[in-house]
């Protein structure tokens, strides 16, 4: 009798994706983040579903419905904070996952990489719209400021913004549609993640050396299932600590004040995971220029395969590129810090310098360094 795992139409797909999948024998813990992102997505969809059962997407009741969830619903506070801090864990895993791809040259799998960039945009859109739903001060003003950026688009800008708002300001119509989009987008993300995985399994995983590993493969289960469980345990421990000890650490206290269109908060800033892009937006004094820089700060990932000049795929054997990679990481951390600071000296100039360095590193310095390293190999 044939093994049902290998013959059943559905089990066959699961088997070839998670059980008998041939994986390189030397992939490190940096390869754990794909599975962690899957866990995060499932957790966000489940907690979000239970929150949606009690949430009302109306400007009059949205804030009090969130309060009701935290005070009156059984373990509502737990579900709410798991969802809010789960988003932070999601983005930590996302950034580390993208960083791994940049360091080890995984972007050479073009389809997988480009769908990954699309996924990043989709998750960012989902998180932004989710932040609007509690209808606190930062929700309202964040939505106003960010949607208003679209008015910088020539000719159609103003009409576009009013179309998205469903009126002449952020109001009931905006909140309702944001809730609808926030509910549907995670399922689109899940579908895209399936396609991401499909394209990855066409080529197989990359590995730290960047060399072809076809001659040395091991089955995914039990080796990498066990290895992934360690990552999952660390994720759960970190998230639990955050939720149970300091659930509001990553949030903004202004969001505990109900939305008031007549009162602007002193410092409007998004959640921490958008601060690097927000800093790039603010560092350009022109509105349209800022919006373009904001979009390009993420969209630039799509052209990274074109900028790959090195003879080796991975940075493992390229010490000069390694240094530049860590400078890029430090630069992004600097931008994240600046995004949370008020617009005043010296933060403005630091943000502008960090923004210029960010684009210079990716577009110019790293490709040139790769070419220099190619020459050094001719000794």
UniProtKB/Swiss-Prot annotation:
Q: Which domain of life is it from?
A: Eukaryota
The protein's matches in SUPFAM superfamilies, at most eight in alphabetical order, are given as: a domain/subunit of cytochrome bc1 complex (Ubiquinol-cytochrome c reductase), Transmembrane di-heme cytochromes
Q: Where are the transmembrane segments?
A: 33-53, 77-98, 113-133, 178-198, 226-246, 288-308, 320-340, 347-367
Record carries keyword DNA repair: no
Task: Please give the InterPro entries that the UniProt record associates with this protein.
Answer: Cyt_b/b6_C, Cyt_b/b6_C_sf, Cyt_b/b6_N, Cytb/b6-like_sf, Cytochrome_b, Cytochrome_b_C_euk/bac, Cytochrome_b_N_euk/bac, Di-haem_cyt_TM
Describe its assembly.
Answer: The cytochrome bc1 complex contains 11 subunits: 3 respiratory subunits (MT-CYB, CYC1 and UQCRFS1), 2 core proteins (UQCRC1 and UQCRC2) and 6 low-molecular weight proteins (UQCRH/QCR6, UQCRB/QCR7, UQCRQ/QCR8, UQCR10/QCR9, UQCR11/QCR10 and a cleavage product of UQCRFS1). This cytochrome bc1 complex then forms a dimer.
Free-text function comment from the UniProt entry: Component of the ubiquinol-cytochrome c reductase complex (complex III or cytochrome b-c1 complex) that is part of the mitochondrial respiratory chain. The b-c1 complex mediates electron transfer from ubiquinol to cytochrome c. Contributes to the generation of a proton gradient across the mitochondrial membrane that is then used for ATP synthesis.
Q: What name appears for this protein in its UniProt entry?
A: Cytochrome b
Q: Give the originating organism.
A: Crocidura watasei (Lesser Ryukyu shrew)
Query: Taxonomic lineage per UniProt?
Result: Eukaryota, Metazoa, Chordata, Craniata, Vertebrata
Primary gene name: MT-CYB
């Amino acid at each position: 009798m044939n093994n049902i795992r290998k013959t059943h139409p559905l089990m066959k797909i699961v088997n070839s994706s998670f059980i008998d999948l041939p994986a390189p024998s030397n992939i490190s813990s940096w390869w754990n983040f794909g599975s962690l992102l899957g866990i995060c997505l499932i957790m966000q969809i489940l907690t979000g579903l239970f929150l949606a059962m009690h949430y009302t997407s109306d400007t009059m009741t949205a804030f009090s419905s969130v309060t009701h969830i935290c005070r009156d619903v059984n373990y509502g506070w737990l579900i709410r904070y798991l969802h809010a801090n789960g988003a932070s864990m999601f983005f930590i895993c996302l950034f580390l996952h993208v960083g791994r791809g940049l360091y080890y040259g995984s972007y050479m799998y073009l389809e997988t990489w480009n769908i990954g960039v699309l996924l990043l945009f989709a998750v960012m859109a989902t998180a932004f719209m989710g932040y609007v739903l509690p209808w606190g001060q930062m929700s309202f003003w964040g939505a106003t400021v960010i949607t208003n950026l679209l008015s910088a688009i020539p000719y159609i800008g103003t009409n576009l913004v009013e179309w998205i708002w469903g009126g002449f300001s952020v109001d009931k119509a905006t909140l309702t549609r944001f809730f609808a989009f926030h509910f549907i987008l995670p399922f689109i993300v899940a579908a895209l993640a399936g396609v991401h995985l499909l394209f990855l399994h066409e080529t197989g995983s990359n590995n730290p050396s960047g060399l072809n590993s076809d001659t040395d493969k091991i089955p995914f289960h039990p080796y990498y299932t066990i290895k992934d469980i360690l990552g999952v345990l660390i994720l759960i421990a970190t998230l639990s600590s955050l939720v149970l000890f300091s659930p509001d650490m990553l949030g903004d206290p202004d969001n505990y004040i109900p939305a008031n269109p007549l009162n602007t908060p002193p410092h409007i800033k998004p959640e921490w995971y958008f601060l690097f892009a927000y800093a790039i937006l603010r560092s350009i004094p022109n509105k349209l220029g800022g919006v373009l820089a904001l979009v390009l700060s993420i969209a630039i990932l799509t052209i990274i395969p074109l900028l790959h000049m090195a003879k080796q795929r991975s940075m493992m054997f390229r010490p000069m590129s390694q240094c530049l990679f860590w400078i890029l990481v430090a630069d992004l951390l600097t931008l994240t810090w600046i995004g949370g600071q008020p617009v005043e000296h010296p933060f403005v100039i630091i943000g502008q310098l960090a923004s210029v360095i960010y684009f210079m590193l990716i577009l110019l310095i790293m490709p040139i360094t790769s070419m220099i390293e190619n020459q050094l190999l001719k000794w």
